[in-house]
Swiss-Prot record:
Domain Laminin EGF-like: 204-253, 254-300, 301-348, 349-399, 400-451
Organism: Homo sapiens (Human)
Known glycosylation sites: 40, 182, 205, 218, 245, 267, 305, 428, 468, 481, 500
Extracellular topological domain: 31-514
Record's protein name: Multiple epidermal growth factor-like domains protein 9
Compositionally biased intervals (Pro residues): 167-176, 187-199
Amino acid sequence: MNGGAERAMRSLPSLGGLALLCCAAAAAAAAVASAASAGNVTGGGGAAGQVDASPGPGLRGEPSHPFPRATAPTAQAPRTGPPRATVHRPLAATSPAQSPETTPLWATAGPSSTTFQAPLGPSPTTPPAAERTSTTSQAPTRPAPTTLSTTTGPAPTTPVATTVPAPTTPRTPTPDLPSSSNSSVLPTPPATEAPSSPPPEYVCNCSVVGSLNVNRCNQTTGQCECRPGYQGLHCETCKEGFYLNYTSGLCQPCDCSPHGALSIPCNSSGKCQCKVGVIGSICDRCQDGYYGFSKNGCLPCQCNNRSASCDALTGACLNCQENSKGNHCEECKEGFYQSPDATKECLRCPCSAVTSTGSCSIKSSELEPECDQCKDGYIGPNCNKCENGYYNFDSICRKCQCHGHVDPVKTPKICKPESGECINCLHNTTGFWCENCLEGYVHDLEGNCIKKEVILPTPEGSTILVSNASLTTSVPTPVINSTFTPTTLQTIFSVSTSENSTSALADVSWTQFNIIILTVIIIVVVLLMGFVGAVYMYREYQNRKLNAPFWTIELKEDNISFSSYHDSIPNADVSGLLEDDGNEVAPNGQLTLTTPIHNYKA
């Protein structure tokens, strides 16, 4: 009975090891399943994703025998949990010549070096005494490679065997015991492998617009084949240099100008980022105020702040302001000059277009401009004065009207500048414009002033020409014949009188002649009006002439209404107011009343 109990006690370690082995297998299966889902399996002590297929050395320095390979996915699961314990199968007492096939299986579930080893019990055939007296120790053996048998997951990768070397653990020395038929090693149950399932078909989910083929992609990465201008795993976004056109829903190229754009990519609306002075959706032209589109962009217009725009190709300024002109608005227009101060402002010339050409210029050493050219009759820096031989007439210089009777050498001005009156008339002329002859001179057919001549009769019948001057100064010589003298004197005086009247008429000016004519016309008109008035009065007098005495009352109206009188005296006898014998009805409705008072009836 004691032997049976002892055998039962000895079999307990074997049963415990078997239970531990089952637990280790379950833990390994769970780890393999999680690793298969992640796509990675890590060998014990190895790098991630690497498989060590080399067999380890056998026990006691003997060559190792190859183990059957177990399939496992190459992907390694991330190590996120705590270190896992390595479970060892219980070792049975073996002889030194034992085959390596009886080497215990080491199942590793992680890189942890913690080892749990079941205690080795004595052989059931070994007596206790021998166990106590045995001093022989077994040589330490090198750990044998352990092959982990796992089931393949749904990953499409090719399963390979993963060899995990077991950590070196000193073995407990066991005494060499004779083999006995009673001692037996529990057989290790074979590992069962789950049947592998075929990999499922990969769904591409490529973009209909951006991919070449909706159902064609890389089965490993899932990358679709994109059209030009598209990118992304499913070709769902636009590449750099392209933008999404919301109208068509397609990725279109930006087409930004390399000269005018700061960068080739554009924004989501397709607008490029332009350089300074460049405009346009693709930055391909210069904006107002810039010119010369090139690889450096556009240059600002050089218009001296007098124009806001210029020609896009040549840079010539357009619409120059502030009375300026030129390609860069650097000059002043006609009739303007550039001020000498720092502003360089274009100011209007102080030159009238009536007196000059209107243009002016200013010298570098002067502060006031001068007119370039004055018209005839004007002088001065601003052409505002009359030249010699001209006079001011209502702010206009007119030429002196002296008819050539003033010497311009002796009298340069010829006439007074303020009034135009001729100065120093020559050629026996006088007057405001030298239009008259001096006393004793008359105009000839050519308009010159010549002396007057008088024809005097002689006793012999001939005539003598005597000038007016000689007549006024000489005294006639008396003659012997007394009868001839009065005749001669009368003739002389008559001739002198006629000559004086002619001279008087010659001295009458045109203005005076006009006044005389006007006066005569007025007198004639007044006389005609008086004559017409007299005729009218005479006819009226004839029409109103009466046969009655002067005290007769005249009634001017033929129809006289007596309605008021009849209303006041309804029973009055109008015919009895006057005597039939003593009153007569005057013609034209006139009523004549006689003087006797008794002719009226009460």
